[in-house]
Curated annotation (Swiss-Prot):
One of its GO terms (molecular function) is DNA-binding transcription factor activity, RNA polymerase II-specific. Residues 41-57 have a biased composition (Polar residues). Its main location: cytoplasm. It comes from Danio rerio (Zebrafish). Transmembrane segments: none annotated. Keywords: Cytoplasm, DNA-binding, Nucleus, Transcription, Transcription regulation. This is Forkhead box protein O1-A. GO terms for cellular component: cytoplasm; nucleus. CDD domains: FH_FOXO1. The keyword Transcription applies. It is found in: Cytoplasm; Nucleus. Residues 1-57, 208-277, 359-406 are annotated as: Disordered. It comes from the Eukaryota. Residues 238-249 have a biased composition (Basic residues).
Length: 652
C-alpha cells in the first residue's frame, strides 16, 4: 500500500512541481468540475496535472500525507491503546482512491465522493490521530497507569522508567542511556508539573522518593505556569495600578464632564502624570533632580522652581579644597518665609520680577561651564551680557538707587534670594595651583550657621534706615556647614555704571555669624551673587586698570560695567554697606582687593574652604585691618579679630 502511494506521487508530480490547489487548506473544499470523463481520463496520463484533475490530486495529496506520517511513526508497531479504527479508515480511503485512478468511476466525479474522502481524512486527523509516537496517551496518562499498576500504588522514578520500557512498545528499544535522555526528562518534567502526582519521602536512607497519585485528585491537565514576580503579576503593583485606574476614572468623571475635559484627554496617555497613582507619581517625578542635578551637568539648576525637597543627590560638591569634603544640606528659606520678611507694598513687584526671571534660566552659553584658573580667563559675564536672556538677577524695575526706597532693595534682594538656587552659571573648582594654606586636615573648619540664626537675624538690628536684616536669610542660608556669606547684589548698578556716587546696598553683616568666619565683602555687580568661596581664585589678579579686568576673575559678572564702578560690600563700611558716606572713591579703595568670582553659583548648597578663602583673600588686603595667625590654622584656628569701621569680630 505504501508502494502504491509512492507510485501515485511520482505519477502526479514527477518534477516536484506545486500542486494546482487554488484553495488549499480551506474548508469546504472546492467542488470538482469535470465537463466530461474523457477529458479527465486523458489528463491523468499527462505528467503535469491540469486544473480539471484537481479533486483527485487533492484527495491523493491528503492520502499521501497520511501515509508519510504513518511511515515516520513506526508503521510496523501497533498503537498501545488504539483499536483498528485507523487501519479501517486507511483501507477505506485507498479502496476508494485506487479504483478511481484505474477505472475513473464516475463516483469521484460527484462532489459527494470527494467530500467523503476529505471528511474521512479530517476524521483521522481529529478523533483518531495519535498525539504522540506511542499513541494517544500523554506522558501524564502513562505515568498514572504505571503507578496504578503497582501493588503499593507508588513507584520511584527508576521504576517508572522500567515500566515505560516494559509496557510501552515505543520505549522498548529506547531504554539505554543514549536514547532515553529525552523521554526520561519528559517523565521528570510531568511528575513535577502536574498536581495529580505527589512526592513522598522514602523511609530508607539513600533511596529516591516515592511518587504517588494525589488522593485529592489534583488537576488532570497542566497547571498554570508558575512565573516569577514581575511588574505584570505583582500583587502590590496590581493594587496600586487598580487604585490609579480608579482615581483616573474619578478624575475623568469630575465636574469638567467626562471625556470632554482636558484632564481626561491627557490622562489617557500612559506616560502622563495623570495616569499614575500618587504612590508611583513620587517616584516618577524623582528622576528629574537625579539626572539633571548640578553635580552631574555643571550647568546650573535647570528647572524653574525652587525645590526645597532635593535629596543628597542634588547636593553640590563645589570646591575640592583642603578639608572641604562634607555635603551641605541646608536649603533656601521657603517662599512664605521670604515673603513674610518683605514689605507688603513690594510683594507684587517681587513676584513679577520672579516670573520675569524664570524665563531666563536656561544656560544660553554652555561654554561658560568650562573649568579655568587664574585671572586671565575670559569672563562669562561678557557672554551673559551678550545673551539677551541673561539678567536673572537684575530686577527690571530697578533703575537707580537714588530713586529707590528700601522696599526696592528688598525687591532686588528677594529676586536674588529666590533665584539664587537656580543660578544659570555653573560651578567651577578652584585651581589646583592655588596655595593651599591648610594642607591635610589642618583647616579652619566649616563655620556652621545655627538653626535659630534665621529668626534671630530677622529680628535683630532692624532699623528703618538700614537695609533689612532679613537679608541674612539670603546670606546665612547658604550651606548648613558653611560660613560662606553670599551677599545679595546691589541695586545701584545703573548709577555706578555712570561713575556717579551712590549708596551700596549690598550687605556684609559682620554681626550675623556671631564669632564665626567674617563674611568677606564681595564685589557685587547687580546681576548675580558673588559667593565668598571663589575669592581665593586670584585675589591679587586683575586691577581696575582696564575696566573689565577686575571682573574677569573666573566668573566675574561685573565685566559688563566697562570702566564703571561695580557696587560691592566694603569691609570698611559700617557692616551693612549703608550710609551716604559710602561713595565711589571708597568703593575704589577696596575694589581691587575683592575680585568678583562665581557670580552665578547657586547659594542653596555648596562647600567652601573657608581657610583657603580667608588666607588667599583677606591676608593680602592692604587696607583691611585683619589680624590672622597663620601658624595656628593647622589646628582649626579662627581669626581673632577682623576690624571694620563699626563692628569688631570676636572668635566664637
Amino acid at each position: 500500500m505504501a508502494d502504491a502511494a509512492q507510485n501515485q506521487m511520482v505519477e502526479i508530480d514527477p518534477d516536484f512541481e506545486p500542486l494546482s490547489r487554488p484553495r488549499s487548506c480551506t474548508w469546504p473544499l472546492p467542488r470538482p468540475e469535470f465537463p466530461n470523463p474523457a477529458a479527465a481520463d486523458s489528463n491523468t496520463s499527462s505528467p503535469a496535472p491540469s486544473v480539471k484533475q484537481e479533486p483527485s490530486s487533492t484527495a491523493d495529496f491528503i492520502n499521501n500525507l497520511s501515509l508519510l506520517e504513518e511511515n515516520e511513526d513506526y508503521p510496523d508497531q501497533k498503537p498501545l491503546m488504539l483499536c483498528s479504527e485507523f487501519q479501517c479508515q486507511e483501507n477505506c480511503i485507498h479502496q476508494q482512491q485506487i479504483p478511481s485512478q484505474q477505472q475513473q468511476v464516475p463516483v469521484l466525479s460527484s462532489p459527494v465522493a470527494a467530500a467523503a474522502a476529505a471528511a474521512a481524512a479530517a476524521q483521522r486527523k481529529s478523533s483518531s490521530s495519535r498525539r504522540n509516537a506511542w499513541g494517544n496517551m500523554s506522558y501524564a496518562d502513562l505515568i498514572t497507569k504505571a503507578i496504578e499498576s503497582s501493588p503499593e500504588k507508588r513507584l520511584t522514578l527508576s521504576q517508572i522508567y522500567d515500566w515505560m520500557v516494559k509496557s510501552v512498545p515505543y520505549f522498548k528499544d529506547k531504554g539505554d542511556s543514549n536514547s532515553s535522555a529525552g523521554w526520561k526528562n519528559s517523565i521528570r518534567h510531568n511528575l513535577s508539573l502536574h498536581s495529580r502526582f505527589i512526592r513522598v519521602q522514602n523511609e530508607g536512607t539513600g533511596k529516591s522518593s516515592w511518587w504517588m497519585l494525589n488522593p485529592e485528585g489534583g488537576k488532570s491537565g497542566k497547571s498554570p505556569r508558575r512565573r516569577a514576580a514581575s511588574m505584570d503579576n505583582n500583587s502590590k503593583f496590581a493594587k496600586s495600578r487598580g487604585r490609579a485606574a480608579k482615581k483616573k476614572l474619578a478624575l475623568q468623571g469630575g465636574p469638567e464632564g467626562g471625556a470632554d475635559s482636558p484632564g481626561s484627554q491627557y490622562g489617557k496617555w500612559p506616560g502622563s502624570p495623570n495616569s499614575h497613582s500618587n504612590d508611583d507619581f513620587e517616584a516618577w517625578t524623582a528622576f528629574r533632580p537625579r539626572t539633571s542635578s548640578n553635580a552631574s551637568t555643571l550647568s546650573g539648576r535647570l528647572s524653574p522652581f525652587i525645590d526645597d525637597e532635593l535629596g543628597d543627590s542634588d547636593v553640590h560638591m563645589v570646591y575640592p579644597g583642603p578639608g572641604s569634603g562634607t555635603k551641605m544640606t541646608s536649603t533656601l528659606p521657603s517662599l512664605s518665609e521670604m515673603a513674610g520678611s518683605l514689605g507688603h507694598s513690594g510683594s507684587e513687584n517681587v513676584m513679577e520680577n520672579l516670573l520675569d526671571n524664570l524665563n531666563l534660566l536656561s544656560p544660553k552659553n554652555p561654554s561658560t561651564g568650562g573649568p579655568g584658573s587664574g585671572s586671565n580667563q575670559s569672563s562669562p559675564s561678557s557672554l551673559m551680557q551678550a545673551s539677551p536672556g541673561y539678567s536673572p538677577y537684575s530686577s527690571p524695575g530697578l533703575s537707580a538707587v537714588s530713586q529707590q526706597t528700601q522696599q526696592d532693595f528688598r525687591k532686588c534682594l528677594y529676586g536674588q534670594a529666590g533665584m539664587g538656587s537656580m543660578s544659570p552659571m555653573p560651578m567651577q573648582p578652584l585651581p589646583e595651583s592655588k596655595p593651599s594654606f591648610g594642607p591635610g586636615g589642618g583647616t579652619m573648619g566649616q563655620f556652621n550657621c545655627t538653626a535659630g540664626l534665621l529668626k534671630e537675624l530677622l529680628t535683630s538690628d532692624g532699623e528703618p534706615g538700614d537695609l533689612m536684616p532679613s537679608v541674612d536669610t539670603v546670606v546665612s542660608q547658604s550651606a548648613g556647614g558653611s560660613g560662606c556669606m553670599l551677599p545679595p547684589y546691589s541695586s545701584g548698578r545703573n548709577e555706578l555704571m555712570g561713575g556717579g556716587p551712590t549708596h551700596s546696598h549690598t550687605l556684609s553683616h559682620p554681626h550675623n555669624m556671631h564669632g564665626q568666619a567674617p563674611p568677606t565683602s564681595v564685589a557685587l555687580n547687580g546681576r548675580s551673587l558673588h559667593p565668598l568661596t571663589a575669592i581665593g581664585h586670584s585675589s591679587v589678579g586683575g586691577r581696575l586698570g582696564s575696566g573689565k579686568s577686575p571682573m574677569q576673575m573666573q566668573y566675574g559678572g561685573s565685566g559688563h560695567l566697562g570702566g564703571g564702578l561695580p557696587p560691592y560690600c566694603s569691609m570698611s563700611s559700617n557692616g551693612y554697606g549703608r550710609g551716604p558716606g559710602m561713595m565711589a572713591h571708597q568703593q575704589l579703595q577696596h575694589l581691587e582687593k575683592l575680585p568678583s568670582d562665581l557670580d552665578g553659583m547657586p547659594i542653596e548648597r555648596f562647600e567652601c574652604d573657608v581657610e583657603s578663602i580667608l588666607h588667599d583673600t583677606l591676608m593680602d588686603g592692604e587696607s583691611l585691618d585683619f589680624n590672622f595667625d597663620p601658624m595656628n590654622s593647622q589646628q582649626g584656628f579662627v581669626p581673632h579679630s577682623v576690624k571694620t569701621t563699626t563692628h569688631s569680630w570676636v572668635s566664637g
